[in-house]
Structures are given as structure tokens and as C-alpha cells.
Amino acid sequence: GFPGKSLIF
């Protein structure tokens, strides 16, 4: 998820 957890996931 983005935005949310990390820049990839």
C-alpha cells in the first residue's frame, strides 16, 4: 500500500 507501509509495498 502507498502511502502507508513502505515505498515498495
From Swiss-Prot:
It is found in: Secreted. Disulfide bonds: none annotated. It comes from the Eukaryota. Keywords: Amyloid, Lectin, Secreted. Coiled coil: none annotated. Its main location: secreted. GO terms for cellular component: extracellular region. Residues 1-9 form the Pentraxin (PTX) domain. One of its GO terms (molecular function) is carbohydrate binding. It is linked to SAP is a precursor of amyloid component P which is found in basement membrane and associated with amyloid deposits. Homopentamer. Pentraxin (or pentaxin) have a discoid arrangement of 5 non-covalently bound subunits. Belongs to the pentraxin family. This is Serum amyloid P-component. It comes from Mustelus canis.
